[in-house]
């Protein structure tokens, strides 16, 4: 009954082997026929087929239905690796964000009692306030680092380039902002440029 090969798992019409293999009609439902020229049981194609079939078998039927605006691996629920499902992203109201930002300007870290009071006042969970402040501190850190990098790159520029960046386009004399050029570094204006109302 067994011709030296391991019994194969049933395949779907979407498996890679079915797509690549020539069309065949099985003779009996209990013993599917495979072409002799097909890949052997130890080929990479068979391994890939086995891996994908195990993966799709492990998925929940409800996980294949569209989730609430989320996509990606976390939307599939607990998988074979025991990952927990992520909580959905909190959409803060404009008033909540305004109050959180206002508090953050004065205080980057909250004491537990202050955090509880703020959460109660805004109608948020304590964990949401904690997470918001953590994310906001991380954003502040990124912004400060980006600003420092910008300042460092500006310091590396020549004064002429800095001047051209500082003046509006079409400015009359770019030489006005070059800094001290001699004993009298103030710009000189001609009589036509000075207007005096009588």
UniProtKB/Swiss-Prot annotation:
It holds the Pfam family Homeodomain. InterPro entries: HD, Homeodomain-like_sf, LBX_TF. One of its GO terms (molecular function) is DNA-binding transcription factor activity, RNA polymerase II-specific. It is found in: Nucleus. GO terms for cellular component: chromatin; nucleus. SMART domains: HOX (SM00389). GO terms for biological process: muscle cell differentiation; positive regulation of convergent extension involved in gastrulation; positive regulation of non-canonical Wnt signaling pathway; regulation of transcription by RNA polymerase II. Transcription factor. It comes from the Eukaryota. Residues 85-144 bind DNA. SUPFAM superfamilies: Homeodomain-like. It comes from Homo sapiens. Signal peptide: none annotated. This is Transcription factor LBX2. Its main location: nucleus. Keywords: DNA-binding, Homeobox, Nucleus, Transcription, Transcription regulation. Residues 24-46, 63-89, 173-198 are annotated as: Disordered.
């Amino acid at each position: 009954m067994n011709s030296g090969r391991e019994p194969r798992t049933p395949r779907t019409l979407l498996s890679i082997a079915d797509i690549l293999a020539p069309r065949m009609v099985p003779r009996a439902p209990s013993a599917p026929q495979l072409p002799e020229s097909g890949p052997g049981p130890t080929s990479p194609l068979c391994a890939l087929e086995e891996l994908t079939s195990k993966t799709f078998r492990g998925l929940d039927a409800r996980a294949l239905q569209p989730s609430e605006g989320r996509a990606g691996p976390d939307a599939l629920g607990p998988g074979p690796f025991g990952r927990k499902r992520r909580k959905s992203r909190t959409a803060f109201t404009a008033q909540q964000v305004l109050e959180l930002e206002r508090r953050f300007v004065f205080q980057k870290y909250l004491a537990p009692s202050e955090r509880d009071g703020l959460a109660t006042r805004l109608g948020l969970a304590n964990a949401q306030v904690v997470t918001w402040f953590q994310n906001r501190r991380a954003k502040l850190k990124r912004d400060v680092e980006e600003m420092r990098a910008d300042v460092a790159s500006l310091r590396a520029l020549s004064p002429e380039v800095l001047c051209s960046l500082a003046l509006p386009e079409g400015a009359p004399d770019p030489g006005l902002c070059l800094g001290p050029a001699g004993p009298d570094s103030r710009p000189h204006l001609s009589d036509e440029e000075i207007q005096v109302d009588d």
